[in-house]
Amino acid sequence: MFLTETHIQVRDMTRQFADNVIRPLAEDLDRDSRFPAEIYDQMAELGLFGICVPEEMGGPGFDTITYALVMEELSRGYASIADQCGLLELVTTLLVRHGTADQQGKWLADLLAAKLRPAYCITEPEAGTDVSGIRTTAVRDGDSWVLNGGKIWIHNAPVADLGFVLARTDPEAGHRGMSIFVVDLHAAGVTRGPKEIKMGQRASQVGPLSFDDVRLPADALLGIEGRGFHMMMSVLDKGRVGIAALAVGIGQAGLEAATDYAQQRKQFGKQIADFQGVQWLLADIAKDVEAARLLVHSAAYKIDAGLDATKACSMAKCFAGDMAVQRSSDAVQVFGGSGYIRGFEVERLYRDAKITQIYEGTNQIQRMIIARELLAKGAAA
C-alpha cells in the first residue's frame, strides 16, 4: 500500500510522540493501572482525537488509512493509549453521522479537545456479542426520557464524563427497538462500580455503570429512535480496522524488541541471533506483522473508497488479533526467561495482545462474518 506525503507525516509525528512520551511511561502506567491523563491531554493538542472528523466540524479531516497509521503507532508505544484514540473515533463518528447540528455543537469540540472523556456503553451481563440481549431501557416521560439498567466492562467508565448508551426503547421491536442516548455520567442516578483489574492494557480504565431513573432531556437521543442498533453497526467496520491496527502495533513493538535483544544477548559464545531457531522466530513475526498491516490498509482503503468493506474489516481484525497473540508469544520466546519477568516490554505486550481477539467482536464472530460474506457474495475478490 503506497502512502501519501500526508500519511507519512502524520505517521512519523505519531511515532515520535510514541517514542518520546508514551513508551517511557508505559511500564509505570501498566504497573499502577492508572489513567494516562497527561498523555490524554497531549494527544488532543496534537489532533489525535477524532482523526476523521471533517475540518468544517473542527476535526483534522483525515481518512481511515491515516486513522489506522495513528492507531498502529500509538499502540507500538502502548496499546492502552491507542484505545483512547479508537474510542474517540467511534463516538465522534457517531456524532458526525447521526447527530444534529445542535448535538455536534454541544459535544464535538469538547470531545476533540479532551474536555469531555467519553464511554461507549453497549455491553451488559446478558448482552456481549449478542447485542439483542440488552435490558437497559429508556422510557418516554413527557418531553424527557428515563433510563434504567446497567452496563459492564465499559471502557473509560471510571473516568468518563459522557456516555453513549445503547438502550431499549421498544421491548417488542427487537433490533428496531434500540436507541442511542448521550448521557451525562455525572447526573443523578448514575453509579460507577469498582474498576476492573485486567490481564492487559491495564491503563485502560474499565468498569460497570448503573442507571437508576436517570432523567434525560429530549436532545439526549442521538439520531432516530429505534435506529440505535443500526447506528452502532454502522461504525463497527471502522472500529475493527482500529483494533486491527492496534494489534499490528503490538506485533511491531514485539518485533523490534525481539530483534534488538537477539543481537545483544549472547549464549554459547555468540549472539542468539546467529541461531537458526531464533532467526525463524524473528522471520515469522516479521512476515505476519507485515501481512496484518497490509490487510488493515486494504480494509481502510475500501472504507475510504465507499466500497463494501465488511469482509475486509473482519479479515483484518481476525488475522491481526491472532497475529498479535501468537507473535507476541514468539517475542517472549526470543527473550527466554527474561521475557516472563515484569518490567520487560515483551511480557506486557503478550498480556496486552489477548484482548484484540475479543473486543469489537470476537475472532470467532469475525470468522462467521467472513464465511457469511463469502457464501452470500462469492469468493471472488
Question: Which ranges hold each PLM region?
Answer:
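Short, charged, solvent-exposed linker or helix-capping segments at domain edges/interfaces
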Residues: 177, 192-194, 218-225
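A short, Trp-centered hydrophobic/proline-enriched beta-strand micro-motif
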Residues: 114-122
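Alpha-helical interface subdomain recognition
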Residues: 1-82, 86, 98-103, 110, ...
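Flexible, small-/acidic-enriched active-site or ligand-binding loops
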Residues: 133, 186-217
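A short core secondary-structure module
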Residues: 143-144, 148-192
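Short Gly/Pro-enriched turn/cap motifs at secondary-structure boundaries
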Residues: 84, 111, 126-129, 153-156, ...
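Flexible, glycine-rich active-site loops centered on histidine and acidic residues
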Residues: 92-98, 120
